[in-house]
Amino acid sequence: MNDQFNGSLSRRNGQSNAWLWAAAGLGGLMAARALLRRAREFDFKDKTVLITGGSRGLGLVLARELAAAGARLAICARDPHELERARADLAARGADVHVFPCDVTERAQVAEWVRVCQHRFGRLDVLINNAGVIEVGPVEVQTLADFEEAMRTHFWGPLYAILAVLPEMRRRRAGRIVNISSIGGRIGVPHLVPYCASKFALTGLSEGLRAELLKDGIVVTTVCPGLMRTGSPRNAIFKGRHRAEYTWFSISDALPVTSIQVERAARQIIAACKSGDAELIITTQALVAVKFNALFPELSADLRALVNQLLPAPGGIGARRAKGKESESALAPSLLTALSDKAAERNNEMS
């Protein structure tokens, strides 16, 4: 009897010791991570920050926040008129800002932009790959060209910019790269298949580079936002029953229960870059969706298929493209989209 009791007690003590060692190990890892984050803390004052797609929406809001932090800014976008309005906006806030017309899908243009920035500022501290396109509609109306455009913008464009800044960052053994992916780069969303496919590619690129570039002193952060009130639906592309597509998309983008104020999102992104975080998922809804998909992939897929049944069927203008501002309906714009509409006015999305 005593032998059995002693054996049972010994096993319990062994289990308790194992839990204590595990807890101590976890505590040590957390402490080491906290120390590492502090060591990576980054000050934006007088640092040169390059932002693609910086003339409107999230890119412009990031530029404003970084200007307030004392950064020197270099922004690029395709539309020179939008760029000039953004330059005036930022200069009025006291920013040291350089603007450059550039299509990120053209490698030569990206290389020239980076060359000009290095010549002007002398060093390249931060690259934020933000430029994006959105095509909304069922897969039946999405063409190969839509997929190619999304990949050129969300994968090849960031890669071109990264390859252009890497030599200077490697030479100094310092630099930050922030890749703006999406919740759509974590979970496939119906009626956004070209967008999601290209954002998945960007997420994979960003995570792989994070692992490889840390040894060179270069910190890569992957950002996966949920819906943000940038005002961008006006300039997104809608296909098929484009008015119905614009209605559901713009309302979802505007409601406080489904989206976040873009200024809050921008501050979170800047904080993640400053701390050198590996990943940032923006909005509680997006974080819950990612965790749920990881834990219950079959159920998550079935729910998304159910959502797809509720979205507009193919038809309408078919594969032709219409911008959001060409797709307005009785409900969009309306009181339901008011917050997004105001954001469009603030963030240079009205052109």
Please provide the spans of the model-predicted regions.
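SDR active-site lid
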Residues: K215-L287, A294-L295, S300-L311
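Active-site helix of classical SDR
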Residues: I162, S198
